């Protein structure tokens, strides 16, 4: 049984509605030392918005500032500034009760060089509307309460700080890893879908078997109307998630754990069934069950549970999330069937519009000027929980000083794998039915080219990109050109039929084509 058999449509749509991941906060180093004692120093991680302020890239170029502890005052009024003043100092305040921008304006008016907000959350506050903070020039950064307490205990009260943001190499190896994962997943998922198609064609021996198989497959088939309804549900779900994030994020985590553990089981059990060893069985409820599958189910559940418990552990939890995510994408590509190219165009086209709208258009609608997709990626309302709908690959610490910060990661949304993967899976099934491999190979290459274009734009624009904006045109245009050049567009558009073939004799299919739509009508 596939994933769609086990999850209700709203739950599946909720998981689908957030399949795009974007980057969030900028990390920097706060180098603290005791005045007059250069040997006594310590580095801490701080978070800032590089759209507001630029920091030097090295400690040598950073400016020394005397640190002033103002956590005992709210700094919400000019009267909160101490008599000695705060000119050319870095002041530390607690979060609240007034808005952090109000604190920044007061600190700036008092001549402070930087405002450090000691907060339990390490998330930098969202930038809001640009007109709100355009007159604020003082550096605003966030440090954790734990780090500030350690700073006072280690270095005392007379502290000097330097702030800088080490630059990363121009070449980001994590993009290569993500590229390999994405192309491998869509290629394997599409090929697996073709293998299932081939097995179905070989197993059909009479009309009764054919009718039984068609009824089973129709449960997983997305008609054009179903595709439209599904995308509408996705839009509704992402809006609900935006307004009720603090509650629904845990629903998403629960759905991901259940769906990904089942997907991992489906992927690994397919390998176990083909292994000559491990065939021992036990009788349970009148059925013979392989002992190896019992252990496998326990392993898959354990992986999901361990990830759920340690999901916020930056050092290694990403490995489990990526394993579960790859299995989830593979299972979904293999399970969901688009019956024809028309359904593929509708699904990919609507999700492309969906992607662009929630990334580029919603900033003109929301009150804070941020896109809904960016807010969900960062966690609205400074929520530390993240949606588990991305492939994450951390950057190796090329600079040891950056080890004090959480590991920076590159991400790719599951939707950027699954959505084009469904098209590639259809191309592979069509190839199996027509005795070729041209559609599968060309669509996979087109996906790889689209990913490369996405990464090039990412490096040029220096900001997160909706990958479907480049993947959808690359894949759809490529397979359309192939279909037109082979004079198979009509057949490719409507979908090829299943035929009862001896030794894969495809000439019957050419002489008596029956479209998938006609199959549905006949039922």
Curated annotation (Swiss-Prot):
Family assignment? Belongs to the peptidase A22B family.
Q: Which GO terms describe its cellular component?
A: cytoplasmic side of endoplasmic reticulum membrane; Golgi-associated vesicle membrane; late endosome membrane; lumenal side of endoplasmic reticulum membrane; lysosomal membrane; plasma membrane
Query: Residues of the signal sequence?
Result: 1-25
Instruction: State the protein's name.
Output: Signal peptide peptidase-like 2A
Q: Does the keyword rRNA-binding apply?
A: no
Q: Where is this motif: PAL?
A: 466-468
Chain ranges on the Lumenal side, renumbered to this chain: 26-175, 246-247, 310-315, 366-403, 462-463
Residues bearing attached sugar chains per UniProt: 51, 61, 69, 119, 129, 135
Q: Does the keyword Hydrolase apply?
A: yes
Q: Which residues lie on this side of the membrane: Cytoplasmic?
A: 197-224, 269-288, 337-344, 425-440, 485-523
Q: Where is the protein situated, by its record's location annotation?
A: Late endosome membrane; Lysosome membrane; Membrane
Looking up Pfam families in the UniProt record yields: PA, Peptidase_A22B
Function noted in UniProt: Intramembrane-cleaving aspartic protease (I-CLiP) that cleaves type II membrane signal peptides in the hydrophobic plane of the membrane. Functions in FASLG, ITM2B and TNF processing. Catalyzes the intramembrane cleavage of the anchored fragment of shed TNF-alpha (TNF), which promotes the release of the intracellular domain (ICD) for signaling to the nucleus. Also responsible for the intramembrane cleavage of Fas antigen ligand FASLG, which promotes the release of the intracellular FasL domain (FasL ICD).
EC number(s) of the enzyme? 3.4.23.-
* Subunit structure, as described in the record: Interacts with ITM2B.
- The top EC class, named as a word, is hydrolase
- In what residue span(s) does the PA domain sit? 70-155
Q: Provide the membrane topology annotation.
A: Multi-pass membrane protein
According to the UniProt entry, its GO molecular function terms are: aspartic endopeptidase activity, intramembrane cleaving; protein homodimerization activity
| Variant or mutagenesis effect after changing residue 498 to A | Inhibits lysosomal/late endosomal targeting
Q: How is it modified after translation?
A: Glycosylated.
InterPro entries recorded for this chain? PA_dom_sf, PA_domain, Peptidase_A22B_SPP, Preselin/SPP
Per the record, the domain comment is:
The PAL motif is required for normal active site conformation. The catalytic domains embedded in the membrane are in the opposite orientation to that of the presenilin protein family; therefore, it is predicted to cleave type II-oriented substrate peptides like the prototypic protease SPP. The C-terminal tail is necessary for lysosomal transport.
Which residues fall in a coiled-coil region?
A: none
């Amino acid at each position: 049984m596939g994933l769609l058999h086990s999850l209700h449509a709203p739950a599946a749509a909720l998981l689908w509605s957030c399949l795009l991941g974007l980057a969030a906060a900028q990390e920097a180093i706060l180098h603290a030392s005791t005045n007059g004692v250069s040997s006594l120093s310590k580095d801490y991680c701080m978070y800032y918005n590089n759209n507001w302020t630029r920091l030097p890239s090295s400690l040598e170029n950073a400016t020394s500032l005397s640190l002033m502890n103002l956590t005992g005052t709210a700094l919400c009024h000019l009267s909160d500034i101490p008599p000695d003043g705060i000119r050319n100092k870095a002041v530390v305040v607690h979060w609240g009760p007034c808005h952090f921008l109000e604190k920044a304006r007061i600190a700036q008016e008092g001549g402070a060089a930087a405002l450090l907000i000691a907060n339990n959350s390490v998330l930098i506050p969202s930038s809001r509307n640009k007109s709100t903070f355009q007159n604020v020039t003082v550096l605003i950064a966030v440090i954790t309460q734990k780090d500030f307490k350690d700073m006072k205990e280690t270095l005392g009260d007379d502290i000097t700080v330097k702030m800088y943001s080490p630059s990363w190499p121009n070449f980001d190896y994590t993009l290569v890893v993500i590229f390999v994962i994405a192309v491998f997943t869509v290629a394997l998922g599409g090929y697996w879908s073709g293998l299932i198609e081939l097995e179905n064609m070989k197993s059909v021996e009479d009309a009764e078997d054919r009718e039984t198989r068609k009824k089973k497959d129709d449960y997983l088939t997305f008609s054009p109307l179903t595709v439209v309804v599904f995308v509408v549900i996705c839009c509704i779900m992402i809006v609900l998630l935006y307004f009720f994030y603090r509650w629904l994020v845990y629903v998403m985590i629960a759905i991901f754990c259940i769906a990904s553990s089942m997907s991992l089981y489906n992927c690994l059990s397919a390998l176990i069934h083909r292994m000559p060893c491990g065939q021992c069985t036990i009788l349970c409820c009148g059925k013979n069950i392989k002992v190896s599958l019992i252990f496998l189910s326990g392993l898959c559940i354990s992986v999901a549970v361990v990830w759920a418990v340690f999901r916020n552990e930056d050092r290694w939890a990403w490995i489990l999330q990526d394993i579960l995510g790859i299995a989830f994408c593979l299972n979904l590509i293999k399970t969901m069937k688009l019956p024809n190219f028309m359904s593929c165009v509708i699904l990919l086209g609507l999700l492309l519009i969906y992607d662009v709208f929630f990334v580029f258009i919603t900033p003109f609608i929301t009150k804070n000027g941020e896109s809904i997709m960016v807010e969900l990626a960062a966690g609205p309302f400074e929520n530390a929980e993240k949606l588990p709908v991305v492939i994450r690959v951390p950057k190796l610490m090329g600079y040891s000083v950056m080890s004090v910060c959480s590991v920076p990661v590159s991400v790719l949304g599951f939707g950027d794998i699954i959505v084009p993967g469904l098209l590639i899976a259809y191309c592979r099934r069509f190839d199996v039915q027509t005795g070729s491999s041209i559609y599968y190979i060309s669509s996979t290459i087109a996906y790889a080219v689209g990913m490369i274009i996405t990464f090039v734009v990412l490096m040029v624009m220096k900001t997160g990109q909706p990958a479907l904006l480049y993947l959808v045109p690359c894949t759809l245009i490529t397979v359309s050109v192939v279909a037109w050049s082979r004079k198979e567009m009509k057949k490719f558009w409507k979908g090829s039929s299943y035929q009862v073939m001896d030794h894969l004799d495809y000439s019957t299919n050419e002489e008596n084509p029956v479209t998938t739509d006609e199959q549905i009508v006949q039922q």
